[in-house]
């Protein structure tokens, strides 16, 4: 009898739990399993195709979809200002805990992943101005020197030999060395070796392969990956170790040969910011530098690859961009390596960059926020307090009501159909997040992209090595492309570097 009572009580508790969970968001459409468990959405991420799965979910169920017992996905661009606010912002959810740097058995708060608004403000305020475009243009000579070295490597390895170039890889190597130049006053050896220095890129990717599914069920990450009681669960962070080694090298260089150091590079400014603010924790310099290494090169490389890939897949668009660049060059308006100022007068280039940022946002998992206790209304649906609400940039950028019936296709001209429309489209982007927690480093990406793309097209004729084949995309937080191969030829009149 006692066993039956216990069994009945257990069934009662479980029934009440599932009844409550099921009904809490029952008015919001979505897959049935989503009302009972988060296993489904974890599995979506595990496939590496979450960006397309989430887009298909919205096409099937609408712009507001129940994705978990306490999670709602939204794809309506009109909801961006409400969810990703500048004033009275919604707090980030435990989703971000899996993305937090983990060193010496503890989480190290950083500007991006921390959920604590006070920590975020304390860490962001001293360095925010460094990332402004008005400041970043002072780094142009260092970006220019890396572009020149990049071109010399392309010339000797691919132009002169006729070999096929793994363009996605080389764009990644370029972006990694630019980050080294502006952060540590030196390239990190990626272009020189033509490969992954100390497996930094591979280790970074491995981190996100493990972290991405954990964002959907964070308690699993707490138990398996960050539990000091489990042997082997707390492992060294190879990417952070690489960054720490570069910091130590840089500090040693500044002591021995201060004239060899750019006193205005990111690391110098990070050190100065730390010295001026006693509230900043001891690991701040490490996490600031790590953010540049871990996120800065990936986002830039992905956007560069997306832009070139879609240009090469759309010859009419490529021809239009080359015509614009060549015409400006003939008027004497362009340097061989374009300056930021010179790129401001190339409207079709600007449209192509924005279209790449729309069609292929590098980060394409839903960016979660927590609805406050008072609740809210999104897309006509009441969302109770405590609900996790999120938007996947990939799905948002394919909203046909805003971006048109051809939202799934490459068409830069959509950005040139009037200032008001262009403004609406731009305000509908989540490429670098939204609100006061948007990505600090987005201007670094744009500086590199706007300088490199026209400079490459002035110098080379580029064609897909296998134009009949599609590239491969895998989403592990970053939607990383692979199998992007090209052939390069020097254009007439181009001199060897």
Curated annotation (Swiss-Prot):
Enzyme Commission code(s) on record: 1.-.-.-
Cofactor dependence: heme
Keywords: Glycoprotein, Heme, Iron, Membrane, Metal-binding, Monooxygenase, Oxidoreductase, Transmembrane, Transmembrane helix
GO biological process: cichorine biosynthetic process; secondary metabolite biosynthetic process
Cross-referenced Pfam families: p450
Residues annotated as binding heme: 439
Gene Ontology annotations for the cellular component aspect, listed alphabetically: membrane
Gene3D superfamilies xref list: Cytochrome P450
Glycosylation sites: 443
Keyword S-adenosyl-L-methionine part of the UniProt annotation: no
Pathways involved: Phytotoxin biosynthesis
Summary of the protein's practical applications: Cichorine and its derivatives are promising in the course of developing novel herbicides.
Cellular localisation: Membrane
Spans traversing the lipid bilayer: 2-19
Membrane topology field: Single-pass membrane protein
InterPro entries named in the record: Cyt_P450, Cyt_P450_CS, Cyt_P450_E_grp-IV, Cyt_P450_sf, Cytochrome_P450_monoxygenase
UniProt xrefs under CDD domains: CYP57A1-like (cd11060)
Primary site of residence: membrane
A GO MF term: iron ion binding
Deletion phenotype: Abolishes the production of cichorine.
Task performed by this protein: Cytochrome P450 monooxygenase; part of the gene cluster that mediates the biosynthesis of cichorine, a phytotoxin active against knapweed, corn, and soybeans. The first step in the pathway is performed by the non-reducing polyketide synthase pkbA that condenses one acetyl-CoA starter unit with 3 malonyl-CoA units. PkbA also catalyzes one methylation step to produce 3-methylorsellinate. The nonribosomal peptide synthase-like protein cicB, the cytochrome P450 monooxygenase cicH and the O-methyltransferase cicE are involved in the conversion of 3-methylorsellinate into nidulol.
Family from the record: Belongs to the cytochrome P450 family.
Full protein name: Cytochrome P450 monooxygenase cicH
Native species: Emericella nidulans (strain FGSC A4 / ATCC 38163 / CBS 112.46 / NRRL 194 / M139) (Aspergillus nidulans)
């Amino acid at each position: 009898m006692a066993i039956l009572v216990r069994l009945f009580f257990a069934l009662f508790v479980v029934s009440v739990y599932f009844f409550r969970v099921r009904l809490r968001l029952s008015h919001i459409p979505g897959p049935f399993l989503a009302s009972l468990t988060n296993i489904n959405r974890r599995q979506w991420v595990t496939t590496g195709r979450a960006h397309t799965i989430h887009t298909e979910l919205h096409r099937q169920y609408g712009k507001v979809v129940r994705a978990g017992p306490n999670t709602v996905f939204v794809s309506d661009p009109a909801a961006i200002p409400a969810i990703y606010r500048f004033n009275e912002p919604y707090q980030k959810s435990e989703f971000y805990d899996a993305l937090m740097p983990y060193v010496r058995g503890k989480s190290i708060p950083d500007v991006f992943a921390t959920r604590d608004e006070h920590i975020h403000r304390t860490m962001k305020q001293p360095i925010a101005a460094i990332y402004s475009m008005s400041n970043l243009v002072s780094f142009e000579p260092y970006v220019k020197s890396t572009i020149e070295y990049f071109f010399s490597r392309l010339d000797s390895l691919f132009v002169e030999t006729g070999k096929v170039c793994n363009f996605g890889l080389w764009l990644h190597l370029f972006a990694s060395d630019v980050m080294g130049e502006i952060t540590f006053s030196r390239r990190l050896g990626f272009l020189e070796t033509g490969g992954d220095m100390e497996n930094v890129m591979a280790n970074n990717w491995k981190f996100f392969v493990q972290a991405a599914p954990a964002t959907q069920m964070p308690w699993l990450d707490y138990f398996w990956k960050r539990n000091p009681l489990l042997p082997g669960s707390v492992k060294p962070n190879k990417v952070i170790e690489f960054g720490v080694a570069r910091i130590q090298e840089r500090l040693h260089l500044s002591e021995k040969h201060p004239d060899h150091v750019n006193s205005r590079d990111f690391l110098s400014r990070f050190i100065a910011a730390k010295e001026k603010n006693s509230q900043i924790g001891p690991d701040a310099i490490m996490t600031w530098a790590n953010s540049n290494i871990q996120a800065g090169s990936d986002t830039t490389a992905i956007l560069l690859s997306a832009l070139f890939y879609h240009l090469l897949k759309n010859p009419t668009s490529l021809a239009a961009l080359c015509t614009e660049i060549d015409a400006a060059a003939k008027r004497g308006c362009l340097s061989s390596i374009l300056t930021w100022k010179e790129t401001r007068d190339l409207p079709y280039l600007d449209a192509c960059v924005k279209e790449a940022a729309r069609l292929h946002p590098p980060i394409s998992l839903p960016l979660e926020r927590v609805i406050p206790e008072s609740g809210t209304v999104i897309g006509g649906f009441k969302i109770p307090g405590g609900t996790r609400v999120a938007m996947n940039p990939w799905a948002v950028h394919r909203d046909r009501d805003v971006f048109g019936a051809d939202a799934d296709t490459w068409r830069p001209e959509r950005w040139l159909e009037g200032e008001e429309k262009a403004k609406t489209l731009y305000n509908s982007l989540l490429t670098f997040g939204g609100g006061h927690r948007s990505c600090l480093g987005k201007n670094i990406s744009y500086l590199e992209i706007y300088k490199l793309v026209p400079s490459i097209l002035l110098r080379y004729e580029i064609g897909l090595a296998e134009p009949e084949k599609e590239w491969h995309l895998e989403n592990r937080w970053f939607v990383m492309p692979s199998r992007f191969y090209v052939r390069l030829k020097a254009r007439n009149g181009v001199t060897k570097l």
